[in-house]
From Swiss-Prot:
Gene for this chain: aspS
GO biological process: aspartyl-tRNA aminoacylation
Top-level enzyme category: ligase
GO cellular component, one term: cytoplasm
Organism of provenance: Mycoplasma genitalium (strain ATCC 33530 / DSM 19775 / NCTC 10195 / G37) (Mycoplasmoides genitalium)
The protein's name: Aspartate--tRNA ligase
Family matches, as Gene3D superfamilies: Bira Bifunctional Protein, Domain 2 (3.30.930.10), GAD-like domain (3.30.1360.30), Nucleic acid-binding proteins (2.40.50.140)
CDD domains: AspRS_core (cd00777)
One Pfam family per UniProt: tRNA-synt_2
Amino acid sequence: MCFNQRILIGSISTEQLNKTIVIIGWIKRIKKLGEINFIIVGDKSGTIQVTCKDKEQIQQLTREDIVIVKAKLQRLDSVRFELINPTIKLFSKSKTPPLIIEDETDALEEVRLKYRYLDLRRRLMQKRLLLRHQFILAIRNWFNQQGFIEIETPTLSKSTPEGAQDFLVPARIRKDCFYALVQSPQIYKQLLMIAGVEKYFQIARVYRDEDSRKDRQPEHTQIDFEISFCNQKMIMNLVEKLFFSVFLDVFQIKIKKTFPVFKFSELFERFGSDKPDLRYGFEIKDFTSLFQDHQNQFTKLIEAKGIIGGIELTNIELSTDKIKALRKIAKDHDVSLEVHNKNNSTLKTSIKCDEKNTLLLVANKSKKKAWTALGAIRNELKYHLDIVKPNQYSFCWVVDFPLYDFDEKTNQWISNHNIFSKPKQEWIDNFESNKNEALSEQFDLVLNGFEIGSGSIRINDPIVQKRLMNSLNIDPNKFAFLLEAYQYGAPVHGGMGLGIDRLMMILNQTDNIREVIAFPKNNHGIEVHTNAPDKIDKEEVKWWIKELVK
């Protein structure tokens, strides 16, 4: 079959010139020019032209057939090679593909997902898979060099009352009980620190039963690590060194050795978000005072102690379509967007604004609501204005997060991060009675407007951990195993989870996480090519019901 003689197309070099070689690949195109046939054959490494004058050899061949080609190598031009006088053998016949298998394809995403195995044949997708592999390999090597050991933690675990909705798995061996697919290796890596491992990492698969988005999937992969006897600064320095090394080795990109650090409150005030894209400006400003002495549509709101925030776009005029898109973002956040420019005179009697500028205004009784909407509008602007350069990577750290967050839907206090994050030392004695002010040892890493990592220094005192759980109305008995472990000499420890999928999305300069995952779910959480989740056999359903209600 000549498999042992095969040469990958991408490895062909001048050393094989004028020699007979063997390639195996898929037919990408067939072009006839008089008596000569030009066949483009490709494998995972590249493509090459095969020039054939023998009609009989190719008359049964079509696009995406696999062929074995034995031919003489020669130059096509100063850069490219071609194969001449070939012997072509059909190895595997292909049906007519339902999509164009080229870097540029006109297939809808649902078609690409249904025939993902064909979509992945595209060289663009092959490059993304390879880049992901090289990235993960470099991460593993770097952690190994730093003295970390990779330890696999369980995927089937215990459902705990924190985080997102669990994926539940019925347990046949224990009646009326369920496993939960882990949302994070959090508890296990803390137990590993108590076990004296000190430096742990893994490339972890984690699961959260939540809606899919462009930057989120129900299952994802993260770089998970934990270290003992550390502080926040040590972890941040470690991550900066990791990314400086990996970006340079894998992507040949030199990033800054240290990342700027911002307080959560500062970022929200300036950008309306705790994950701003710092590649451009457009900071949010308080414009309330400009309207206080004028009768306008904001008068009643100002009298009711409301607030007016805005973003001023210097020397930028927005088209009607762009304004419409921004107003939709505002509407999604349950606020209205006022736009002031030379084409909109609604506010000209109230404020002075340069005719070349555009002012985007949001008014609301709640500053949090107004600023959050403006943050989303600011983020949307980069998709409508030419303000971001390619290959620009802007990292930042976010620190001093609130320990608690108030959920307006349930009218309850919840944990802002997770229930294992340590309160800052100045709040350690009274955080329960100061939920609106208490800060935590949580820190996030942001890249180009996406949260790519979240971590914290953990609680290692069982008394403090119980106090925090009780303040959130969480039964400490649910975590009895962890609280007991804390009583056997628990070191100070901390760590992070860094999202590989989001990182690869950013580095591949695509805006959809599905583009960098081999077999992703669609927007509805469905794996289109297998139709998962799917119904199971009725008899199996009956058996499970019978077992669970025994």
